Amino acid sequence: MHTDTLEHDALARAGAHARIQAACAQACSAIAPAWPLDRAIAVNPHWQRTGQPLRRVAARMALLGGIQVFPPRERQREAWQGGRITPQDLALALQRLPDAAGLAEADCVAALDRPGGLQPLPLLIDVLDNDPARDTRLTWRQAITHQVSQTCAAFFDRAQADWQPERGPGLYAFWRDTLTHDHGIGTLMGLPGLHRGVQALPATREDAEAWAMHHLQLQGGAWADYLEAVLLTVNGWASWCAYLAWQAPEGAPEREHLRDLLAIRLAWGAVLLECKDDAAARQAFAALQAEWRRAPERLQQAEQALVVDEVWQLALELGYQRELAGRLVRAPGLPSAVPEAQAVFCIDVRSEPLRRALEATAPTLQTLGFAGFFGVPAAYTPLGTAARRPQLPGLLPPAMEVTDQLPDPGAAVTARHRRLAWAAQWESTTRWPGAAFSFVEALGAGYLGKLGGWLWPREQARDSGDHAGLPARYRPVCRPMLSGLSLEERAALAARVLKALGLARGAAPLVMLVGHGSQSANNAQAAALDCGACCGQTGEVNARALALLLNDAEVRTALPALGIALPEATCFVAALHNTTTDEIEGFDLDLLPPEARARWERWQPVFSAAGDRVRRERAPSLGLDARAAAGDLLSALRRRANDGAQTRPEWGLAGNAAFVIAPRSRTRDAELGGRAFLHDYDPAQDTDGSLLELLMTAPMLVTHWINWQYHASTCDPERLGSGNKLLHNVVGGHIGVFEGNGGDLRIGLSRQSLHDGQRWVHEPLRLTVVIDAPAAAIEAVIGKHSVLQQLLDHGWLHLWRFGDAGLERREGGRWFAQDAGASGA
């Protein structure tokens, strides 16, 4: 009998352990990754939750993390009262949403005057905080978040601190050891008995999870939700851990960091309970269990309460879609003349105004849109460094290498190493413990020049940083080129890219590959303004590598056998669109034949005129005078790009709202306001639908990520944005930022990226994707990819197509005609 009892207990413990492990894994799976500062790409922070309907996710985020997913009601009230949302938009939104059947227009309008926030479900640290006898400056939540965050900053830092700590076998072990030896934290938290709880901490993460869950004694059905709520209190660091896991191979230790973080944050609540075993704590504990027993009911109520917010979200989008549809159906199409030149731009929304201006200035120029990595899925290693960095979308792994090549690499590498070593030694000298006094007294005046450069910014050109430490004589001949590929592989890549660009036949004599990059000073989040398709880098490396490949004589000789008919005179030129100043810079011009160089030079006045046109279009949003002389306006933007005190060098992708996958004839001359991503696609050339599938599963997902990062950072800037840029402190050299000197790691966009000081510049609209393809072809792609089914069926984006009779929208798996003249069309 005794043996049977022991076996039963062992089985029960094993079952409980398995359920805890499953709940922890489920909670961790809900966290989206956040890329580091030097590779910053936009991410939908709800990406791991898109398998659920949007409103259900909004309800869960509100109750589990106090996070707002839909636009705040006060902003919707402004849009309603200002006429941005019309009565027709509201009526159509109510008609479109089946769950809004019981709502009247008057109910929706009345809801705008009521607070839209929902009370989150409490965590153990929250109910313990309700003890009236506790007197401290910080809540338990604030104190614990700060301690966990500082621990993570020390553990993950590999670049910033000169004195690195011993990290031990993992994040949980590091935290436990840190807490055990920190004898002052109990005093700071007003818990002199904290050491008792710390001593009770289990040695391993798995035991800590079981220990903490045993203390909580929640019903099994609430475990995963409670654990997800725990992670959301340190969502920034959780997102960083998710990124490390995203990048790591199976079985790597980096895949365990997120679970370690969950165990740390979970264990803190149990530690507090160990320290506060009194009547108040027991009463608070009972209240916690009562609240979480009602969690399923609370979630259902929250989802119903948010129906009105979903209605207003759609109403806001319908107003924009009406305008978009009208502009698309009025687009006049391409001119009949054969283009004298072609310019391939990134699909980025900032390319749209420049493409429009170039075509208006020179009708014989044809512009094309393509993902900014130009089909070169490479990692780039600058000359003489080990700094291998991705130059492709974050969803993809690098498949090839780009390295710098030049005539005398040995001498250049030696010279660069020498200069970089001197710079590193100088920097380390300034960080000596006594340097805070002696260095400033002796050499502080030497920094007056740098300070003056910020107070009176100059008009210096953009510096990519890839040539830092390289003597000037080597820079013009240092070229990023594909390496390690055979002629057959290089030719196949060239053919693949040319077909995707639509240039397999009839290329112009001059084809410009125009990447893009931003220019700013003293900006920790500068990479977020560069090319997302190049993993937060500029498109220079990809454009140059591809142009050099396509101009290679051996590759050109091999292309006809692969079905590519490039005219012999066609020459490719790599260029970069500076999105801060709207200037275009060319590269490797010294390698061009005389005829091609002459053609490039003839286009320079067109670039200048088009750039001036775009600068005047952008000037009012930047507080500049659009009527200023051309040179004065350009000078002002150049100085802005070098101003270390400028928190808004440009607006980035603020305002993004649509993605058009279609021939340029569908959008040419349509004034899309810099709000649309544009990718060229000709369905007639894609007979098997393979290119359409690629576009819907790569660029479409990237634009969705961008759209939702801007949406989330606007709707909840405190929890899903990075706060005030003026208060940013860089963590770990490149990991992310703190707002101030602590708190959670901040993810998302800063307030200055979305708000001009008076009003919000970005409108939180779900992306409207418009595709020129048969409905059957689109449905075939959707049917093959569950991620697309989830995004569409669960309301994360809108999908339209160009039909024979006009625009059509997809709704509930069916296609409906759009009337471009009707409200909400």
UniProtKB/Swiss-Prot annotation:
| Residue sites binding Zn(2+) per the record | C346, D348, H516, C531
Record keyword Cell inner membrane present? yes
Chain segments annotated as transmembrane: none
Q: How does it sit in the membrane?
A: Peripheral membrane protein
Which UniProt keywords are present, listed alphabetically? Cell inner membrane, Cell membrane, Membrane, Metal-binding, Transport, Zinc
* Entry GO MF terms: zinc ion binding
Q: A single GO CC term, please?
A: plasma membrane
What cofactors does the UniProt entry give for this protein?
Zn(2+)
* Alphabetical list of InterPro entries matching this protein: DabA
Location in the cell = Cell inner membrane
- Any Pfam family matching the protein: DabA
Protein family membership? Belongs to the inorganic carbon transporter (TC 9.A.2) DabA family.
Q: How does it assemble?
A: Forms a complex with DabB.
Summarizing the function annotation, the protein's role is: Part of an energy-coupled inorganic carbon pump.
Q: What is this protein called?
A: Probable inorganic carbon transporter subunit DabA
Q: Which organism is it from?
A: Paracidovorax citrulli (strain AAC00-1) (Acidovorax citrulli)
